[in-house]
């Protein structure tokens, strides 16, 4: 919790407060691209179901899952090549040539939801194939973003929790409106489905002081990405599959490790 204490102390200093808010309150990382308006449509929770995600296994195609920043990266695919259950999964296909570099490049799978209460648990499965690391900061993660949260301070436009799943062992960059919680620090295992889960409500309570209430929407992103790639180092490649994604009460979690 010392990071939170230091952060709040800095925000009390007027000059630093303006700087911090200016560089670190984008929906993704400081200096990153801004999502095109209308790309993702917030969803009401499915009626009569514990899972807040619509189409969690991609058996009904891609919607209402969406992709952000299509000017930077291609959209996700619905694949029948590999699936944890059923016949389909979501595929993020990273293909970045060796000569390309940059601060960050993110391949996304996103759903936005508007539940009345903040959910308890996220779980699911990922699978990695063809992992070629083009920079030390190449990794998988999922991100939970709560927008317009009146009960959390400081008063950022959004409050985030970020969950690296594999590929990095240290925080990849500084961001004022997010905390990192590592679910894995090793290189990703390839050729097998890997289960993950996290009580996101407890994490918001621990790191932000309370679970979000009164928010306008939640955005959940499942990613493969890199940060700080130097041109000419190596190609950054991966095929990352996500399937059987769940967000809701822990007691109703349909997934098992």
Region locations from a protein language model:
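Extracellular carbohydrate-recognition regions
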Residues: 27-72, 256-257
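Bacterial N-terminal signal peptides that target proteins for export
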Residues: 1-12
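Extra-cytoplasmic beta-strand recognition segments
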Residues: 58, 107-147, 197-200, 244-245
């Amino acid at each position: 919790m010392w990071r939170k204490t230091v952060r709040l102390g800095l925000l009390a200093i007027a000059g630093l407060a303006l700087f911090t808010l200016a560089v670190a309150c984008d929906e993704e990382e400081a200096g990153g691209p801004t999502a095109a308006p209308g790309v993702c449509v917030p969803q009401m929770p499915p009626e009569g179901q514990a899972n807040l995600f619509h189409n969690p296994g991609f058996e009904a195609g891609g919607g209402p899952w969406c992709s952000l920043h299509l000017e930077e990266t291609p959209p996700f695919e619905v694949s029948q090549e590999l699936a944890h259950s059923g016949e389909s999964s979501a595929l993020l296909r990273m293909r970045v040539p060796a000569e390309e570099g940059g601060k960050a490049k993110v391949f996304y799978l996103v759903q936005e939801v508007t539940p009345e209460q903040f959910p308890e648990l996220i779980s699911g499965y990922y699978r990695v194939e063809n992992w070629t690391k083009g920079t030390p900061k190449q990794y998988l993660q999922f991100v939970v973003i709560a927008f317009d949260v009146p009960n959390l301070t400081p008063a950022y436009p959004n409050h985030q929790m970020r969950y690296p799943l594999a590929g990095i062992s240290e925080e990849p960059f500084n961001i004022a409106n997010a905390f990192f919680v590592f679910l894995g620090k090793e290189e990703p295992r390839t050729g097998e489905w890997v289960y993950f889960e996290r009580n996101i409500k407890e994490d918001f309570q621990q790191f932000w002081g309370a679970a979000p209430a009164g928010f306008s929407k939640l955005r959940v992103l499942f990613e493969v990405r890199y940060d700080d790639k130097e041109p000419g180092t190596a190609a950054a490649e991966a095929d990352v599959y996500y399937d059987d994604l769940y967000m809701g009460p822990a007691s109703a979690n349909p997934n098992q490790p």
